[in-house]
Swiss-Prot record:
This is Photosystem II reaction center protein Psb30. Keywords: Chloroplast, Membrane, Photosynthesis, Photosystem II, Plastid, Thylakoid, Transmembrane, Transmembrane helix. Its main location: plastid. HAMAP family: PSII_Psb30_Ycf12. Signal peptide: none annotated. GO terms for cellular component: chloroplast thylakoid membrane; photosystem II. It comes from Emiliania huxleyi (Coccolithophore). A core subunit of photosystem II (PSII), probably helps stabilize the reaction center. PSII is composed of 1 copy each of membrane proteins PsbA, PsbB, PsbC, PsbD, PsbE, PsbF, PsbH, PsbI, PsbJ, PsbK, PsbL, PsbM, PsbT, PsbX, PsbY, PsbZ, Psb30/Ycf12, peripheral proteins of the oxygen-evolving complex and a large number of cofactors. It forms dimeric complexes.
Length: 34
């Protein structure tokens, strides 16, 4: 049977990995605009 716990952990890890640089880029972009 499929283990959803591992899938949830991988998805959350991927979200954190992708959202980290995205937030930094957005903050830098907004500061650069001002």
């Amino acid at each position: 049977m499929f283990n959803w716990n591992i899938v949830a952990q991988l998805l959350s890890l991927a979200l954190v990995t992708l959202s980290g640089p995205a937030v930094i880029f957005l903050l830098y972009f907004k500061r650069g605009n001002l």
